């Protein structure tokens, strides 16, 4: 019990020092920097030229889908590295666990592929146009309204 407490204690001290370092750096920079805002400092600057249009750029949603899939498989690799270093003593059960883990991710990728989320150029649906309706003959004596 004592050894576990000292191990977690060192992790806690490390986290506490990290938080103190970040907060201390933020507060020090906040106290020491000059703060004199004016309209010219707050204006947009683009290489000496006046800004034209908005700075907001709309990205296609396909970029985000590709980025999310990359992050998912990147995290998978992060989980697989420690497993690969201790694979031999863990045995067959650990191999089955990792295969299930990878299989679930591959099923998700296959679902996204079948759904069409990985198609960069999506086909446009071919909607047939209706032929024009023929004009009906007007009965004799009936008046036509314009």
UniProtKB/Swiss-Prot annotation:
Q: How does it sit in the membrane?
A: Multi-pass membrane protein
Looking at the record's lineage, which domain of life comes first? Answer: Bacteria
Q: Which reaction does it catalyse?
A: a quinone + NADH + 5 H(+)(in) = a quinol + NAD(+) + 4 H(+)(out)
InterPro entries with a match to the protein in the record: NAD(P)H_OxRDtase_bac/plastid, NADH_UbQ/plastoQ_OxRdtase_su3, NDAH_ubi_oxred_su3_sf
Instruction: Please name the GO terms that the record assigns under molecular function.
Output: NADH dehydrogenase (ubiquinone) activity; NADH:ubiquinone reductase (non-electrogenic) activity; quinone binding
Segments spanning the bilayer are 8-28, 63-83, 93-113
Q: Does the keyword Translocase apply?
A: yes
The record's comment on protein family reads:
Belongs to the complex I subunit 3 family.
Q: What does this protein do?
A: NDH-1 shuttles electrons from NADH, via FMN and iron-sulfur (Fe-S) centers, to quinones in the respiratory chain. The immediate electron acceptor for the enzyme in this species is believed to be a menaquinone. Couples the redox reaction to proton translocation (for every two electrons transferred, four hydrogen ions are translocated across the cytoplasmic membrane), and thus conserves the redox energy in a proton gradient.
What name is this protein filed under?
A: NADH-quinone oxidoreductase subunit A
Species this chain originates from: Chlorobium chlorochromatii (strain CaD3)
Organismal lineage: Bacteria, Pseudomonadati, Chlorobiota, Chlorobiia, Chlorobiales
